[in-house]
């Protein structure tokens, strides 16, 4: 009885394998006659991808890969003609085709009558991928239009990596660095949109290394590094950016100095900012950064002097106005705390009117101006609320609270 059961099981297995092989041939015929049926044919072919017999045969994956590329060829022509196509499926067919071909290559070995092992599909697979090399870029664009950003990035990854892949290197000529750099930049945008900041940072850095020196590349790289809380990367990228765009955007200096402050390497920070001030002595932002640095080092008087210099050079620098106003506010609070004790109410009122309130009002003026220039400075609003509360100025307190 056991022998009969085992025989039945063997016959069932063989029958299943034969059915899958027949299915593979059927799908091959259907794809040849109707490339547009590719999506449906892959659903039909799905069992062959997991069947122990057909899943280990190169033919199964080769047919799927060729079907994907033929579908792309047909549908991309339709797209050029202005016909309605599913851009997501169109772009994905290139990725799927490459994946299918990649599975076929290591399985492609045929033993001839003389016992020699040869390949049956590999030559055509390499040719197919090489001939469709530029289509990986086109596929990425189709996927981008369909807002399939991770998939678009994957297509661009193939476009940028295939020329250096030993399997395809002889058949594919790498594009110029300028095009490579632009595509790496686009990959960074795609990964940023997909919130993959680590990959985006690498993409932007690769683009810069390949000669993409537009300001956005540096700024987006810094933004990605910021999302990763990587101050060192922010500083390294800023150093390169400052060489090109430092005159128009001195925030780069701030990122470099912040990195030193975070590491408490104040001497290096001082040396860096002093060097740039020597080179550009009329740059208000440099004095602002110097002021913040001095404040971090506990050099309050130097901080105030540098912040004041920043405002004198640029009275529209909202951050400098805020920091300067805040330092005056701190001074008022310090005087009040250190000198305002052990007094009668009358003496304290006189003391406040002469020494504290004038400083609070002066600070308020700078803070108010900072908000006129940049209404997003929430810290300015917070300090102003405290000032007007201490001045018993209900009208201005209510106004600031309603901002």
PLM features per residue range, with description:
Residues 47-50, 106, 161, 206-209, ...:
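Conserved structural position within tetratricopeptide repeats
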Residues 53-55, 109, 164, 212, ...:
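Short coil turns that delineate tetratricopeptide repeat
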Residues 67-150, 154, 158, 162-181, ...:
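Short coil/linker segments at helix-helix boundaries
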Residues 60, 168-172, 183, 216-218, ...:
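TPR alpha-solenoid repeat register
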Residues 68, 143, 184, 191, ...:
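Residue at a conserved register position within TPR or TPR-like alpha-solenoid repeats
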